[in-house]
Amino acid sequence: MKKKEEVTITFYAAECGEFHDFGEYTKCKTLEEAYKKYQKYCKTSANMCPSIEFSIHDPDSIYSDMEYPLPLSSKDRGDLELVPYYNEHPLVNEAIRQLEKLQKQQEKKKHRDVAR
């Protein structure tokens, strides 16, 4: 019997979320790394609409190894809902929770820095 491949997720930071060839497009080891790159792009290339994207590696899915934007806000969640496979996938939902934590930590840090 063939061993079933583990389903995994990979993250990317895109300097230009719409046209990846217009800027840097970096494969990241973790969501935290992708978020740091995304923040850098927001400071240096905000007009290029930076994004964080993900790819699910699942040999049993037609969506395997396709990149898709990770929602950066609740209004972006609508795009994810267009693809039920992604919207309901536990790895994607965990990534969204992690991203929300990272964003909250960044906001707290920003408020602390302003208060100084």
Task: Name what the model sees in each region.
Residues 43-109:
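Short, mixed-charge low-complexity intrinsically disordered segments
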